[in-house]
Amino acid sequence: MAAKVEPFWIRKTLEQLDQDEWESLCDGCGLCCLQKLEDEDDNSVYYTRIACKLLDLKTCQCSDYPNRRDSVPDCIQLTPGKADEFKWLPRTCGYRLVSEGKDLPLWHHLVCGDRDAVHHERISQSGRMLAEGSVAEEDWEDHLIFRAG
């Protein structure tokens, strides 16, 4: 009987992942691409339902991922070296979970094999986001959906 091989996200550290493994941790929820507001009093980060101008509102995928930082200079690039900063990511985020030594959820495409499960389980904001250009920045506070952490 062959020994069971643990999935790469269990048996490897973030630093040991190759680029394809790293990218595959993304569940495609798009939550990290929502505009966020920071409370000046306690530094809490709040997610809005307002999507980055490059985020496809239905698929929750970046429309220009390879060149995103050219169009959106403040786009945050997640890397294994920044894992200690992942607390602002949603608790369901594959990057955050693996950085905390946790397993991926059953709906994650690496576990279930279905990239649409994140939408079927309503983890993503697909169909519930607003385009960045449709809401004045001073009105973003009216569209808060949850607090990070």
UniProtKB/Swiss-Prot annotation:
InterPro entries: Puta_zinc/iron-chelating_dom, UCP006173. Pfam families: CxxCxxCC (PF03692). It comes from the Bacteria. Transmembrane segments: none annotated. Belongs to the UPF0260 family. PANTHER family: UPF0260 PROTEIN YCGN. This is UPF0260 protein PFL_1499. It comes from Pseudomonas fluorescens (strain ATCC BAA-477 / NRRL B-23932 / Pf-5).
